Amino acid sequence: GEIEMLRSVIVFLVHIFSVIVFRVKLVGKENVPKEGAYIMCANHQSNWDAPILVSSTKRKMHVMAKEELFKNKFIYWLGDKCLVFPVKRGKMDLDSMKHSLKVLKDGEILMLFPEGTRKGMAKNGRAQNGAAFMALRTGVPVIPVNISGEMKPFHKVTIYYGKPLDFSEYKTSKPEKEVLEKVSKEIMDNIIMLEK
């Protein structure tokens, strides 16, 4: 429909912009599944991270973003067209949790930033457990992604895609805190290792 077409145009324009302005280079793209559900987890440096990752992925991707962004009317409009949905930070958000589980059950892609805040890794921020929870509830693979380089015009940005992480052995409807934290740490460790 019209929204799909508008979304495709927006994604295409962002892709052109990212290649020219941020000189984006993709490494390890062969690690990204061509079909089936998965969770993409990346480090978070700037508000350009999500648009650039979406435009670098051929498939439809649903993006979890902090609720505060949606106060901007343009971002709200854009997000609505580009499958971005809000999450309340620092507390259990059942609506975003249900939406995320539905996305994965429908065989689509969910993207989120496990640190929860920008520059989280630089400050050694502890990973939030949302990605681990989704992976353990659904058994879908997690693709770790590292965005390296500054998101400033004409600075080179490299996106490293890691091999899928399989946590299906821990799949359960009620993940325990210890397992959630173990899986969250493994996801973050894999994101960090990609830059080395």
Regions found by a protein language model. Name each.
Residues 1, 5-6, 95-196:
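Non-catalytic C-terminal accessory region of glycerolipid acyltransferases
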Residues 6, 10-12, 19, 27, ...:
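Catalytic core of membrane glycerolipid acyltransferases/transacylases, capturing the structured
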Residues 14, 18, 41, 54, ...:
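Conserved protein kinase catalytic domain
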